[in-house]
Structure formats: structure tokens, C-alpha cells
UniProtKB/Swiss-Prot annotation:
Organism annotation: Homo sapiens (Human)
GO cellular component assignments: membrane
Positions with biased composition (Polar residues): 322-341
Family: Belongs to the opioid growth factor receptor family.
Domain of life of the organism encoding this protein: Eukaryota
Protein's UniProt name: Opioid growth factor receptor-like protein 1
GO MF annotation list: opioid growth factor receptor activity
Keywords: Receptor
Record field: compositional bias (Low complexity): 43-66, 431-443
This protein's encoding gene: OGFRL1
Tissue: Ubiquitous.
Disordered as annotated region, ranges: 1-89, 308-451
Biased segments, Basic and acidic residues type: 362-381, 389-399
Stored InterPro entries: OGF_rcpt, OGFr
Length: 451
């Protein structure tokens, strides 16, 4: 039995997202997938590595439920899709956590069994029978093959045929240890029988192994067996165990072809539709290579119906963050543009007020223009009559005339102007003369307003 290491802290994942790293490195383009049952590991694959320090192998996760509860929970979840679900499915935290620990070699657990206690290897070497039934591996492979009733209803052999580093329902079965795994891989006799056991179970499901790379296809009796598989959901738990054991004993590359085949039959051919939830929630996530998982999930997404209920794709959080960033940038730009527009409007309003001021000044000039010669008569002038008859030749007059539509000049005599001028008009004329002395005052005021 495995035991938790004292003094070593491992942060238990608390969400599905913590357990699932499938889409964390999704920059490379994916090639077109081969046909159903095809696929193998290629160069450049990304084997998933633990996020924590290197874990100790072996042992049953202490934080997991008890063995019977563990299997019952898995069986209930994997068998919960006996009919086509109409509601949108949800990710299972139990499944995500269980498969996270498997892919990461069961973090922070170590072997406490003696290295010479190689129960699983000795069983596959035909040295000991599996308990409690007392049947040897050779008898299972020769006499149980094709006996689908026995394979269906006996629930103690599967833990011996496909051992794991975690406890199952059969307490007589022993968990694998790191040392035992290495010894098992070196033993050709054990490997040969292990592959025969795998073929036997594939045929029980209606599938056959077609080559040494792990490709699979429909068996001769596939219709009968697929119907049975579609109705017996406890076998989905067995498939999960088989996939895990393949990875432990050196056949990781066999997983993808089998999972791809099951997805094709469930989603495209619709021969085993009830298995699709377990295939997407469990089978896919037994694969340690992120790239292979992404290929399978992309294939499933193309054929999953209804498409809006597919929940195993890239996290929507990352997509929404990207859209939020775009939305954040556009309001900033629009606010900047609005501020610029407001600034321009302020300038325009100031310019318009300046123009109004100029127009008012011009109107005042028009009013007092006939009175200016009075001031000229007050000043000493050698030719008062000529000055009164001629238009004024100052810069202010020319500016005023350009800005206004040539005001009419009334020629009056100095005597008439003297009679019509009052003290108030004299003051206004004085102010107007001050503006004429500084012909640039209007422009300066305009500049001050703009600033």
C-alpha cells in the first residue's frame, strides 16, 4: 500500500482547471488526423511533466476515497450517461483529479512494499494464481477467452490483468511499484501475456488489434458486442483501467489509437453513443501527451452534437481575456478621441467667441466712425476740411473695412459734427482711437482666448 510522505507538501488541485493542462501549450499547428483507429506518437511530442518537484512512484493516493468508494464513484460517473444527455454536460472534478494524479505519477507517494514482493509480475509469469479465484494467467488466456459471460460478471480478475499503482475493488490485488514496473518491462514472458490479455479484452468489447503499433478496428462480432458495450456502463471503468495500465507497463502509444477509435464509433458512426461522455472525460485524459489529447479533443469537437455543449475545448477564460483586452483598448482610444474632439470644440467655441467679439468691435467702429473727425478737429490740423471729406487712411480703418462690407461714409462739415457730438461720444471716440493706435490688439486678444 502506498503511504503519504511526511514533511513533503503537495498542493492538492482544487479545480478542474488546476488538473487539466491540455491547452496550456497550444501554439503549434496540428496535422490532419488519420482515419479511425490510426495514430501513434511522433517526434516533438510534449510529455506532460509534473508541475511540482519529481514525485515518488507508487502507492494509492491517500487523499482519494477508499478503494470501494473510489471505484463506485468512478463507476457511477462513467455509467451515468446510459441515455443521450439533453442537458449540457459538466466537467467532473473527481475524474480530473484522479487522472491528474495518474499522469503525474501519483505525487508525493512512495512504495512501502518490499521489492521482492512482485505479485503482479509473478502472476504474469504464471507462478501464482490471482486471488481470490485461484486461477492462473494461462488458464485465463486460454479458457476465458471468448467466454463473454464470465468476463462480464466476474469482477476480480481485471485488477490482476491490468495492475495499477492504486488500489481497486479487489483487496487481494496488489498495487504496482516502481521497481516492479521496471522488472515487468524487462520480462518478455510477462509482456507477451500482457498483450494477449489486452487482445482478449478488446475482443470482448468488439474490437481487434491490427498491428504492433496499437492500431485497432472492428472485430467480426462488433455489432453484438457494441450493443452490449453501449448498455453496460461498468465496462467503461474497465476501459479506463486498461488504458492506465498500458501507460504504466510501457504501451503509452497504444492509448491514442484505441481512444480515437472509440470516439469515432461514438460520435461519427453512433454505434456506441452512450460511451462518449466517459471517452471525453476519462479515456482522453489517461494520455500523458498534451499534443495527443488536443488532437483527440479537436476530432471530437468536429463531430460532437450539439456543438455548443462541447466543454472539453480551450478554456473560455483565455478567449474572454483576449476579447476584454480588445474592448479595453477601444474605449481608451475612443476616450482619447473624444477628449481631442472636446478640445477642438473648446477651441472652436473660443474662436467663435473671439469672432463675435471682433464683430461687436466692428459694429462699435461703425457707430463711432462718423464721430472720429470731431477728435481730428480737436487736434491741430492744417487741412481740417480735407480730412473730413477723405476716408481715413489708418490701419484700423483698412482692417475694419476688410472685415465689414464697406460701410457708407457720410460727409459732414466740422460744424455739424461739433453740434451733434456729446461728452459721451467724445469718450467713445477716445476709446476707439486707442484701439486704432494698436491695430494688433484684436489679434492679441484672439490669441489670449485660444490659450
Amino acid at each position: 500500500m502506498g503511504n503519504l510522505l511526511g514533511g513533503v507538501s503537495f498542493r492538492e488541485p482544487t479545480t478542474v482547471e488546476d488538473c487539466d493542462s491540455t491547452w496550456q501549450t497550444d501554439s503549434e499547428p496540428e496535422p490532419e488526423e488519420p482515419g479511425p483507429g490510426g495514430g501513434s506518437e511522433g517526434p516533438g511530442q510534449e510529455s506532460e511533466q509534473p508541475a511540482q518537484p519529481p514525485e515518488q512512484a507508487g502507492g494509492r493516493p491517500g487523499a482519494s476515497p477508499a478503494p470501494d468508494e473510489d471505484a463506485e464513484a468512478a463507476g457511477a460517473e462513467q455509467g451515468g450517461d446510459s441515455t443521450e444527455a439533453t442537458a449540457k454536460p459538466k466537467r467532473s472534478f473527481y475524474a480530473a483529479r484522479d487522472l491528474y494524479k495518474y499522469r503525474h505519477q501519483y505525487p508525493n507517494f512512495k512504495d512501502i512494499r518490499y521489492q521482492n514482493d512482485l505479485s503482479n509480475l509473478r502472476f504474469y509469469k504464471n507462478k501464482i494464481p490471482f486471488k481470490p479465484d485461484g486461477v492462473y494467467i494461462e488458464e485465463v488466456l486460454s479458457k476465458w477467452k471468448g467466454d463473454y459471460e464470465k468476463l462480464e460478471h466476474n469482477h476480480t480478475y481485471i485488477q490482476w490483468l491490468f495492475p495499477l499503482r492504486e488500489q481497486g475493488l479487489n483487496f487481494y490485488a496488489k498495487e504496482l511499484t516502481t521497481y516492479e514496473i521496471e522488472e515487468f518491462k524487462k520480462t518478455k514472458e510477462a509482456i507477451r501475456r500482457f498483450l494477449l490479455a489486452y487482445k482478449m479484452m478488446l475482443e470482448f468489447f468488439g474490437i481487434k488489434l491490427t498491428d504492433k503499433t496499437g492500431n485497432v478496428a472492428r472485430a467480426v462480432n462488433w455489432q453484438e458486442r457494441f450493443q452490449h458495450l453501449n448498455e453496460s456502463q461498468h465496462n467503461y471503468l474497465r476501459i479506463t483501467r486498461i488504458l492506465k495500465s498500458l501507460g504504466e507497463l510501457g504501451y503509452e502509444s497504444f492509448k491514442s489509437p484505441l481512444v480515437k477509435f472509440i470516439l469515432h464509433e461514438a460520435l461519427v458512426e453512433n454505434t456506441i453513443p452512450n460511451i462518449k461522455q466517459s471517452a471525453l472525460e476519462y479515456f482522453v485524459y489517461t494520455i500523458r501527451d498534451r499534443r495527443e489529447r488536443r488532437k483527440l479533443l479537436r476530432f471530437a469537437q468536429k463531430h460532437y452534437t450539439p456543438s455548443e455543449n462541447f466543454i472539453w475545448g480551450p478554456p473560455r477564460k483565455e478567449q474572454s481575456e483576449g476579447s476584454k483586452a480588445q474592448k479595453m483598448s477601444s474605449p481608451l482610444a475612443s476616450s482619447h478621441n473624444s477628449q481631442t474632439s472636446m478640445h477642438k470644440k473648446a477651441k472652436d467655441s473660443k474662436n467663435s467667441s473671439s469672432a463675435v467679439h471682433l464683430n461687436s468691435k466692428t459694429a462699435e467702429d461703425k457707430k463711432v466712425a462718423p464721430k472720429e473727425p470731431v477728435e481730428e478737429t480737436d487736434r491741430p490740423s492744417p487741412e481740417p476740411s480735407n480730412e473730413a471729406a477723405k476716408p481715413r487712411n489708418t490701419e484700423k480703418d483698412s482692417n475694419a473695412e476688410n472685415m465689414n462690407s464697406q460701410p457708407e461714409k457720410t460727409v459732414t462739415t466740422p460744424t455739424e459734427k461739433k453740434e451733434s457730438v456729446s461728452p459721451e461720444n467724445n469718450e467713445e471716440g477716445g476709446n476707439d482711437n486707442q484701439d486704432n493706435e494698436n491695430p494688433g490688439n484684436t489679434n492679441c486678444h484672439d490669441v489670449v482666448l485660444v490659450q
